[in-house]
Design a protein with these regions (language model features):
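Structured soluble/peripheral alpha/beta segments that form catalytic or ligand/cofactor-binding pockets
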Residues: 1-192
Length: 192
């Protein structure tokens, strides 16, 4: 990363701090997306499954209130584990140096049907995209983001009697690592 991130050094107001780790793993046929976010006034854990062949998608989010940094998202994308959940769901991102393990389950993902999966992302030595964007409207507002693209992915997801296989030869992941203090009214563009 370009600069060190320290949540405690932010002067933009405790309720304005936004932090998330978002992973998308995809191939030509389907994708799964996983989110753990601590947006201070609210936390969000999300699982999305997309089937490009139908086309079809479903997202199930669990929100909590006033997380205020209690999720302890890491100050760097290069180390640190992230996990959250209850008895009914869990999402875990484990960083093992040369690879990452993403594991998850949700008892009621859609219509009472569970979803579960485990994906391994290789961490090759490669470039990534990093931006640090100030907001002209407010001098304490900023967006610090790193996107690590094209991470070779392998693993599977189980949902509704179907196994979605992610083969290393044809499946790739992206980590969208975001931290910052946003202005109240803004426009957000996302691409990878």
């Amino acid at each position: 990363l370009l600069m060190d991130y320290d949540r405690n050094a932010i002067k933009g107001g405790a309720l304005r701090i936004k932090e998330w780790d978002y992973y998308l793993i995809a191939n030509n046929d389907y994708a799964v997306a996983l989110t753990i976010a601590d947006n201070s006034y609210m936390g969000l854990d999300g699982i999305s499954l997309l089937d490009f062949r139908k086309p079809w998608q479903h997202t199930s989010n669990v929100m909590s209130f006033m997380t205020l940094g209690k999720r302890h998202l890491p100050a760097s994308s290069s180390k640190g584990d992230v996990s959250n959940g209850t008895k009914k769901y869990s999402i875990r991102f484990k960083h093992n140096g040369d690879h990452r393990i993403l594991s998850f389950h949700m008892d009621n993902f859609l219509d009472g049907k569970p979803i579960s999966g485990e994906i391994r992302l290789e961490n090759p030595e490669q470039e990534s995209m990093v931006i640090v964007t100030p907001f002209a409207e407010k001098d304490t507002a900023f967006y610090y983001n790193q996107k690590i693209n094209c991470l070779p992915a392998s693993g599977s997801v189980e949902f509704d009697g179907q196994t979605y296989i992610f083969a290393k030869e044809s499946s790739f992941g992206v980590l969208d690592w975001g931290r910052g203090v946003w202005t109240y009214d803004n426009v957000w563009y996302w691409g990878s």
